[in-house]
């Protein structure tokens, strides 16, 4: 009984927080349930932490998106809200109609596919369709790729799809940049996130562009969005699109399998049908997983490059402030310098530096007679701002008397107008 009482009392006296490891003698005196609870807690904690962390990330992202949506909604006027609701309903209707149309188009193409396969006019018309859907906000790029494979087979359809995609995306990039030039300049000067993303393309621009092109993003919208980054050149964007053209084999392959299933459905055995259907499903799954994985890697790489760029700018700002010299240009490229300057303003706010002119406030001190100093004083009368820099040879400013009748001191300090 005393032994049980002693072990129970010792177990109850253990702290709630994780304690240091006990000696072997003390470990033997711990009750059995203490060992079981400790082992169960240590075993379950990694998975619990992982699931909790993933759940928290999803909840945080959803909360941020909801908060941003509410904030944007409150800023809209009455008619803007009506227009937003109408645009959302129209987008839903167009999406449903497009899904229905996509399902029916292969039934319509079945009887004419063999005839169109030998027609160069049909080849050119389909090529133009792929070319023009590269311009935002048109849709149907993936559907036309599947149709190319359906009519011309995997390899000829891929050639049609790839060439039209490369030329169309490059032309869309150039046109979008010309039309959206004012929007680009405004975004570069005001939006720090936009400036940061533009600077990330300065390091491994071609590699990051290829990753962006492989992401499952709306094709035409992506062409217009990337064109707003001034650090991306049209030829580089066209080269990145050409490098990822093997990805376009996926819709062409799916289209060719659909034609085989539609034409030889009665002649094919159940095993052949299963192989074709499974190949389509597997190809779609590989494409979705690859796009999702590359999308995650692209975001991670963009964050890494942004952190590196911010660190370089922060070091430059701290060095300039320590040496009491003005900030120079960050790059000889004007577009890169504009983006870096926007990011530098954000870093100055984070660090606490302020070099704005509104911090230099002129204070006018009147004498007893009420006379005021004219605002048109020359720099010759007052050669420079007042500085708190004294040496042993300086006299006491408070012991020299009042000095002139009135003085104006330029104080480098924060003064808020009352």
Swiss-Prot record:
One Pfam match: VTT_dom
Positions with biased composition (Polar residues): 1-10
Subcellular location: Golgi apparatus membrane
Region (Disordered): 1-26, 367-388
Keyword Cell inner membrane: no
Residue numbers on the Lumenal membrane side: 1-81, 141-157, 256-273
GO biological process, one term: mitotic spindle elongation
Purpose: Golgi membrane protein involved in vesicular trafficking and spindle migration.
Protein family: Belongs to the TVP38/TMEM64 family.
This protein's name: Golgi apparatus membrane protein tvp38
Organism, as annotated: Aspergillus fumigatus (strain ATCC MYA-4609 / CBS 101355 / FGSC A1100 / Af293) (Neosartorya fumigata)
Gene this chain is encoded by: tvp38
């Amino acid at each position: 009984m005393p032994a049980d009482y002693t072990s129970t009392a010792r177990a109850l006296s253990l702290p709630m927080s994780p304690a240091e490891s006990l000696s072997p003698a003390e470990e033997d005196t711990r009750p059995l349930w203490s060992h079981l609870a400790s082992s169960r807690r240590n075993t379950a904690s990694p998975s619990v932490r992982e699931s909790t962390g993933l759940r928290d990330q999803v909840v945080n992202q959803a909360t941020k998106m909801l908060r941003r949506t509410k904030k944007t909604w409150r800023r809209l006027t009455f008619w803007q809200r009506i227009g937003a609701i109408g645009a959302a309903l129209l987008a839903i209707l167009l999406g449903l109609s497009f899904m229905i149309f996509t399902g029916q188009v292969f039934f319509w193409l079945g009887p004419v596919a063999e005839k169109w396969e030998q027609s160069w006019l049909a080849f050119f018309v389909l090529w133009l369709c792929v070319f023009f859907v590269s311009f935002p906000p048109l849709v149907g790029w993936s559907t036309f790729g599947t149709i190319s494979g359906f009519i011309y087979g995997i390899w000829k359809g891929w050639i049609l799809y790839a060439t039209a995609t490369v030329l169309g995306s490059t032309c869309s990039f150039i046109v979008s940049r010309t039309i959206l030039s004012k929007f680009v300049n405004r975004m570069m000067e005001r939006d720090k996130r936009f400036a940061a993303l533009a600077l990330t393309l300065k390091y491994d621009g071609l590699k990051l562009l290829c990753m962006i092109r492989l992401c499952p993003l709306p094709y035409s919208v992506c062409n217009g969005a990337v064109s707003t980054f001034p650090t991306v050149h049209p030829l580089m964007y066209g080269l990145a699109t050409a490098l990822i053209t093997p990805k376009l084999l996926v819709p062409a392959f799916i289209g060719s399998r659909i034609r085989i299933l539609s034409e030889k459905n009665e002649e094919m055995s159940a095993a052949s049908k299963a192989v074709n259907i499974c190949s389509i499903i597997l190809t779609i799954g590989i494409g979705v997983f690859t796009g999702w994985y590359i999308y995650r890697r692209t975001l991670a790489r963009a964050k890494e490059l942004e952190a590196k760029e911010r660190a370089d700018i922060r070091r430059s700002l701290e060095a300039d402030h320590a040496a009491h010299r003005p900030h120079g240009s960050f790059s000889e490229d004007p577009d890169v310098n504009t983006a870096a300057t926007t990011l530098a303003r954000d870093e100055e706010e984070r660090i606490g530096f302020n070099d704005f002119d509104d911090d230099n406030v002129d204070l006018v001190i009147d004498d007893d007679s009420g006379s005021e100093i004219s605002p048109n004083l020359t720099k010759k009368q007052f050669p420079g701002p007042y500085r708190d820099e004294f040496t042993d040879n300086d006299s006491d400013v408070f012991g020299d008397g009042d000095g002139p009748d009135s003085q104006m001191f330029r104080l480098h300090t924060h003064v808020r107008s009352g």
